């Protein structure tokens, strides 16, 4: 795990098979449970750099019915002052249909636990919730045909791939900037490829580069094996809300819904076209044989906090913008971020720069501005 982080990977860790605290151990003694293990991964994220560029990243997954789940949640809740708390690793819970249906049907113990889960999410932003039976129902056909079931997720919970004792799932990610969708929707390069097609070719090439380089690293054998058999990609998007604003569409409007479907259907169909062509040119990997595709997975909506800043997308992933003006503290420094669509609107209306101070005081809101209307 540490070597994967060192060489640039974000890591998801499933601890569901670890004995709960107090369980007897065959060699004598008692299990210390999940939390000490979680602390070790949390420490590792602080001392191991990710690709030599930034601090390592881990996400720890646990089934919601594991006896140690409450203790894990309390360790993530910074408000409780738990000395065993950890702050740098994310936490995720896998939830089965039976568990959630029982909770909804009135199981009081499960309802109390789920209430704690939601409180912790409100305070810390995690745990992620992965409805694992639903995930396996939606697995690609090549997975279902081979009985490849998913048990956990990745660092940021945007991917659900098979993993086992001799396979560690690997996926390469990139996101298209929907804030500039109107510019690249009809673009075709000299090769005749669309942006999603070209992006799929690029990501598949990154997989090949990973296999070539990681094959020379002994500790990466399981990851290389998975990449060779699956070649999973994760082409996503960012800047969706900014696209809506450029079109004058409220986030929850019917027009926004239609635009969302149009854009992502275009990306899906073009990415599939590229993967089919790649399969014709270079062959299908082991787990895709008979599917006609070069890649077991193609799309994933990842968080894009840094990428959205670099690319000018402003809004992260497919999330709504929560502030039009804010101060962002990042690894390279502290920066002021302004909504570029709003800034252009102010210029159009002749509204002076002093207006931004009032927006900052209103925590990024523009509800107080008489100079703006619903139209």
Regions of interest found by a model, annotated:
Residues 1-375:
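Long, C-terminal-biased catalytic regions of enzyme "large/alpha" subunits
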């Amino acid at each position: 795990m540490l070597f994967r982080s060192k060489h640039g990977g974000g890591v998801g860790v499933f601890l569901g098979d670890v004995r709960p605290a107090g369980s007897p151990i065959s060699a004598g003694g008692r299990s210390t449970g999940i939390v000490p293990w979680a602390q070790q991964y949390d420490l590792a994220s602080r001392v191991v750099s990710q690709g030599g560029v930034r601090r390592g990243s881990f996400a720890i997954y646990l089934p919601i019915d594991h006896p140690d789940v409450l203790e894990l949640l309390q360790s993530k809740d910074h408000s409780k002052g738990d000395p065993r708390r950890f702050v740098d690793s994310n936490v995720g819970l896998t939830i089965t249909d039976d568990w959630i249906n029982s909770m909804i049907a009135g199981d009081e113990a499960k309802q109390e636990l789920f209430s704690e889960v939601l409180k912790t999410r409100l305070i810390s932003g995690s745990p992620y919730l992965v409805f694992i039976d639903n995930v396996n129902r939606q697995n690609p056909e090549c997975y279902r045909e081979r009985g490849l079931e998913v048990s956990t997720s990745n660092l940021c919970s945007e991917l659900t791939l098979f993993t086992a004792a001799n396979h560690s799932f690997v996926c390469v990610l990139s996101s298209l900037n929907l804030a500039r969708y109107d510019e690249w929707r009809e673009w075709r390069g000299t090769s005749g490829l669309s942006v999603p097609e070209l992006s799929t070719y690029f990501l598949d090439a990154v997989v090949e580069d990973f296999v070539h380089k990681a094959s020379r690293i002994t500790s990466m054998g399981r990851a290389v094996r998975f990449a060779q058999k699956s070649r999973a990609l994760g082409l996503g998007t960012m800047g969706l809300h900014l696209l809506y604003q450029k079109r004058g569409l409220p986030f929850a409007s019917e027009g926004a819904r239609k635009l969302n479907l149009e854009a992502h259907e275009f990306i899906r169909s073009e990415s599939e076209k590229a993967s089919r062509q790649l399969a014709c040119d270079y062959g299908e990997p082991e787990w895709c044989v008979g599917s006609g595709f070069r890649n077991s997975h193609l799309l994933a909506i990842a968080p894009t906090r840094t990428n959205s800043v670099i690319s000018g997308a402003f809004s992260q992933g497919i999330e709504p913008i929560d502030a039009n003006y804010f101060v962002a503290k990042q690894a390279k420094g502290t920066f002021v971020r302004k909504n570029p669509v709003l800034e252009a609107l102010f210029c159009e209306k002749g509204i002076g720069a002093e207006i931004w101070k009032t927006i900052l005081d209103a925590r990024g809101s523009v509800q107080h501005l008489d100079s703006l209307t619903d139209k």
